[in-house]
From Swiss-Prot:
It is found in: Nucleus. Residues 196-285 are annotated as: Disordered. Interacts with histone H3 and histone H4. This is Histone chaperone asf1. It comes from Aspergillus oryzae (strain ATCC 42149 / RIB 40) (Yellow koji mold). Belongs to the ASF1 family. The gene is asf1. Residues 196-210 have a biased composition (Basic and acidic residues). InterPro entries: ASF1-like (IPR006818), ASF1-like_sf (IPR036747), Hist_deposition_Asf1 (IPR017282). Residues 183-248 form a coiled coil. Histone chaperone that facilitates histone deposition and histone exchange and removal during nucleosome assembly and disassembly. Keywords: Chaperone, Chromatin regulator, Coiled coil, Nucleus, Transcription, Transcription regulation. Residues 218-263 have a biased composition (Acidic residues). It comes from the Eukaryota. Gene3D superfamilies: Histone chaperone ASF1-like (2.60.40.1490).
């Protein structure tokens, strides 16, 4: 756990002329009393290709540090143009704001800085020799890159572990990279097998469909012939039934005409039986 935590950084003059000093309002919190001072430092990266052109703009010792939230203004001079390659003056570069305790850096804040002319004409056609008075810097304050480091403070208990703990079982395990590659190879081989099986299934289904078409046609023809034969048989049966009904109909008429008196006698009996059958329903109500 860090004893000092950086809470915020505000850039006072931004954008500003290239030769104007840098001004930062820094807010930090101290959790316990410190025996030594904090060292703040601002570094200008003169070239992206080599650290040879990096230059320390200024450094400041702050202390003694009271416990709680603290705030101060850190001001640093502009970089020395003689130490910057002419081709690197314009364009994008980086400044680094760092803080150390007892020579041990525990926080670093990096900002992108864009150096460009204040005129569109000069930006479109920059002169061979840069006009420093017309160059303005713009710090991208909204997108800082903050890096924190674990360090030893005043007590030995606060010191971070210099070496990772012993893990003898880790030496027995296989290399993760080799296992990862083997898993990828297995997955790829399994995928190839699945695709091949799927293609074979599709081809076999196509052959089955081609062989099944004649059989289906034969079954349809058999069904049609069976249906026609059934229709013919049904028609012949219907004709025979019609003839039987006509003959039976004549006999029925003769019987009804001859037994008319018997049907009249049976009528009241049927009504009386119906009345008797309805009486239980009335009694229920």
């Amino acid at each position: 756990m860090s004893v000092v935590s950086l809470l915020g950084v505000k850039i006072q003059n931004n954008p500003a002329p290239f030769l104007a000093p840098y001004q930062f309002e820094i807010t930090f919190e101290c959790l316990e009393q410190l025996q030594k001072d904090l060292e703040w430092k601002l570094t200008y990266v003169g070239s992206a290709t080599s650290s040879e052109y990096d230059q320390e703009l200024d450094s400041l010792f702050v202390g003694p540090i009271p416990v709680g939230v603290n705030k101060f203004i850190f001001e640093a001079e502009a970089p020395d143009l003689k130490r910057i390659p002419t081709s690197e003056i314009l364009g994008v570069t980086v400044i680094l704001l760092t803080c150390s305790y007892d020579g041990r850096e525990f926080v670093r804040v990096g900002y992108y800085v864009n150096n460009e002319y204040d005129s569109e004409d000069l930006s479109a056609e920059p002169p061979a020799k840069p006009i420093i008075e017309r160059i303005r810097r713009n710090i991208l304050a909204e997108k800082p890159r903050v890096t924190r480091f674990a360090i030893k403070w005043d007590s030995e208990e606060s010191a971070p572990a210099e070496y990772p703990p012993d893990q003898p079982e880790a030496d027995i395990l296989e290399d993760d990279s080799a296992a990862y590659g083997a898993e990828e190879a297995e997955l790829e081989a399994a995928l190839v097998r699945e695709l091949a099986d799927a293609e074979r299934d599709v081809k076999s289904e196509d052959h089955e469909m081609e062989g099944a078409e004649p059989a289906i046609k034969e079954e349809e023809e058999e069904d049609i012939s069976d249906a026609e034969s059934e229709d013919i048989e049904d028609e012949s049966d219907d004709d025979e039934e019609d003839l039987d009904e006509e003959e039976a109909g004549d006999g029925d008429e003769d019987v009804e005409m001859g037994d008319d008196s018997e049907q009249k006698d049976d009528g009241p009996k049927a009504d009386s039986t119906n009345q008797h059958s309805h009486q239980p329903e009335v009694m229920v109500h």
